[in-house]
């Protein structure tokens, strides 16, 4: 029994970690964050990085636990959500792979009262793709055959979210130094690689969704 729960934890932790790291793509937020904070001193920059990562964690956790309720309220099946989420992820991955314009860049000079939340945390770090990944994981968790496994899977995804937010914070905390070291070319290569992985995750979501829809007929 313990090995079963451990297997569930490892599976959902790694799945959540890979999905979130790929869609959030922490290094890709560095140029935007650097532009957004270029007029701030080091203390203000670190404070914004910390607040943004806290917001990101809350957004993901709320999406994880409330996703099922939202689906029920609108009468959306898990299979349909997975197919739709897979399409969204595939489109986002295609844009990253082929270098389409990033919507975040267009907001880099925006002036908002709380830029740590908008546009940095949402949609700069956690956008629609992130929410699609998390709700997709939520649908998989709800199909487990025991409440103990569901609880274990939820804890695994929360732990993965915490790990990704910690990574994001570490990168944003050192954004200015890292951007200089990687250069524009390095960040572009990494973004394209993440785009390809995102397409793969999207295809997997679509296949899983179609399988669920077919078996429910």
PLM feature spans:
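Small-residue-enriched transmembrane helix starts and helix-helix packing motifs
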Residues: 1-22, 99, 106-121
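Membrane-interface alpha-helices at helix entry/exit sites of multi-pass transporters
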Residues: 41-54, 146-159, 188
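Membrane interface segments of multi-pass transport proteins and intramembrane proteases
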Residues: 75-76, 170-190
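Structural signature of hydrophobic alpha-helical transmembrane segments
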Residues: 12-29, 78-88, 154-168
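Hydrophobic alpha-helical transmembrane segments in multi-pass integral membrane proteins
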Residues: 61-66, 125-139, 197-212
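Transmembrane helix exit motif
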Residues: 88-108, 201-212
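Membrane helix-loop-helix hairpins that form the core translocation module of multi-pass transporters
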Residues: 47-96
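Juxtamembrane transmembrane-helix termini in multi-pass membrane transport proteins
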Residues: 12-64
């Amino acid at each position: 029994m313990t090995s079963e729960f451990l297997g569930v934890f490892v599976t959902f932790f790694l799945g959540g970690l890979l999905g979130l790291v790929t869609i959030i793509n922490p290094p890709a937020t560095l140029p935007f964050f650097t532009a957004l904070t270029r007029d701030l001193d080091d203390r203000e920059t670190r404070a914004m990085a910390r607040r943004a990562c806290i917001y990101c964690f809350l957004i993901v956790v709320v999406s994880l636990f409330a996703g099922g309720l939202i689906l029920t309220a609108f009468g959306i099946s898990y299979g349909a959500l997975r197919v739709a989420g897979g399409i969204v992820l595939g489109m986002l991955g295609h844009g990253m792979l082929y270098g389409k314009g990033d919507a975040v860049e267009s907001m880099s000079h925006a002036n908002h009262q709380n830029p740590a939340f908008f546009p940095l945390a949402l949609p700069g770090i956690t956008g629609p793709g992130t929410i699609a990944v998390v709700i997709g994981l939520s649908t998989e968790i709800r199909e487990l055959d025991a409440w103990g496994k569901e609880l274990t899977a939820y804890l695994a995804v929360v732990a993965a979210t915490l790990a990704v937010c910690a990574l994001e914070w570490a990168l944003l905390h050192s954004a200015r130094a890292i951007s200089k070291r990687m250069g524009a070319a390095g960040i572009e290569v990494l973004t394209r690689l993440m785009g390809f992985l995102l397409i793969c995750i999207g295809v997997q979501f679509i296949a899983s969704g179609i399988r669920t829809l077919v078996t429910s007929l």
